[in-house]
Amino acid sequence: MGGMVLNEEQWIKELQEKRIAYGISQGRLAVASGITREYLNKIESRKMKPSKELLETLHKELARFNPEAPLTMLFDYVKIRFPTLDIQHIIKDILKLNINYMLHEDYGHYSYTEHYSLGDIFIYTSADEEKGVLLELKGRGCRQFESYLLAQQRSWYDFLMDALIDGGVMKRIDLAINDHTGILDIPELAEKCRKREYIGKSRSYKFYQSGELIKHREDYREYMGRTLYLGSLKSDVYFCIYEKDYEQYVKLGTPLEKADIINRFEIRLRNERAYYAVRDLLTYYDAEQTAFSIINQYVRFVDEEPDKRKNDWKLNDRWAWFIGDNRQS
């Protein structure tokens, strides 16, 4: 019995030390773990005894904040349509923001006639009931909204659940995987596509060298380095892999060798595919599991073995490292 208590004590001590070393606040870890900051504070101060399952959850979530982790996950684009014209309700009750602090403009995009914005958080509306209210968060908008969620002691999961309960229709969800150590080699993946060492639901791919014109749909196409698209850009599921370090070099002047993120792998989902991804997120509360299950379902890179059928070719080692369980170690 004493051994179990000691083990639990060590777990809590290690949790607290790692959290502080990672520069993560109690509030941020608590939100990620689905508990309140007050509850986590009581656990760390030994005033509350957590269950084994909760301790495991806390350690698992804390591991995602490890600044030395080779891969990290984030939401990079969110577009949701709400079947209502009550924009104040969406802003107050779903986003939980104050409309009085938002900028109102008498124009919009996507044929909407007006919009409210707070930084890069945009909410569009019009008099057309069929169009309803549209929320759009691009990359910077997602990062800004995360700060508000943290202040609200909510997670992305809480927000998405609120949106679905209110009848929100998922129009687009992008999940981004940041490669901090160069696990992926984009030119190598492009060459494997050319050599047909790529198995996927779609054979379509496009590869652009640095500086080449990328489809107009990219907001920062002039900054993106070598870029590989897997799948048709017109489909409801496709992937975009590009050199994030090059983007930061061109935009901010950050030397390539000092870039925090080397490559970015984006999973872009629309309509029904976006809805099913959100449903999976709200089933497992594990964005990493959802992201890699989608990747594994749609694409894998292999090494040619002439004496075997293509479906039996060996998984490419670098790709296996990227999608495998050992990527966290």
List the model feature ranges, each with a label.
Residues Q26, E38, E44, R264-E266:
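Acidic-residue sensor for enzyme active/binding pockets
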Residues N7-W11, I35:
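Alpha-helix N-cap/N′ positions at the starts of helices
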Residues K13-A32, T57:
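Short basic helix-loop element that most often maps to the first helix and adjoining turn
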Residues G34-P50:
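Recognition helix of helix-turn-helix/homeodomain-like DNA-binding domains
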Residues G2-G3, E8, A21, F65-Q328:
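Structured, helix-rich domain cores that form ligand/interaction pockets
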